[in-house]
Amino acid sequence: MIELQNISWQTPEGRKVLKDVSLKLRDKRLIAISGPNGGGKTTLARILMGIEQPSSGKILYNGRDITSLDVTARAALGISFGFQQPVSFKGITVRRILTLAAGHPLSEEKICDLLQKVGLCAKDYLDRDIDSTLSGGESKRIEIATVLARDTSFVVFDEPEAGIDLWSFEKLIDVFENLRSQEERTLVVISHQERILRIADEIIIIGEGQIKDHGPGPEMLSKMLHSDNLVAHRCGRTEVSYE
């Protein structure tokens, strides 16, 4: 479990982005963090990852204070993250990137298993380069496979739907549904997409740098969709609005 205790963060200019945020992110569930743009979601994700350090407050992982630990040190403890925009590596194959992510040799069977978990036909991708010939959806799923290869127990995904088309997004939802039901790990997904919120065990709403609401996924989504100023899908969109 990760526990945030009174976490605040501000820009060098002094603008407060997170204000005294306290949360418990419990094990073995899919937790969606949502809210309006500029509300503090991505900053919170970066603090969880160790990319940013809070201005004040503590972060505990299974009771251990990890506030000052960087990305590498947190990964060694079992915390990893998926990039919002996957990186291309010309000349590096999918097989190689998954082995590098794992940090040790992987059998072909294991690599195929990782690719199948993210909905890719392994034989078509093992020796493909990680470059611009991959679609946005393919790159996103390979990025998720690299996260799984690290075999960590706590994973943060920052807006995994960014930059992909609708068909790829539908496939991505399938991936997260499968991970939620089959994997013994905690998934924290930063998103405002209703389809992702629908499969969450818990939903946390952040706005103006503070926790606005927090509860079981179905209960929270019902509350959001029955509040006139929170329903975006009534206007034909796939994301939930907080205006």
Residue ranges of predicted features:
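Conserved structural motif at the start of ABC-family nucleotide-binding domains
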Residues: 2-4, 17-20
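Q-loop/switch helix immediately C-terminal to the Walker
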Residues: 85, 91-107
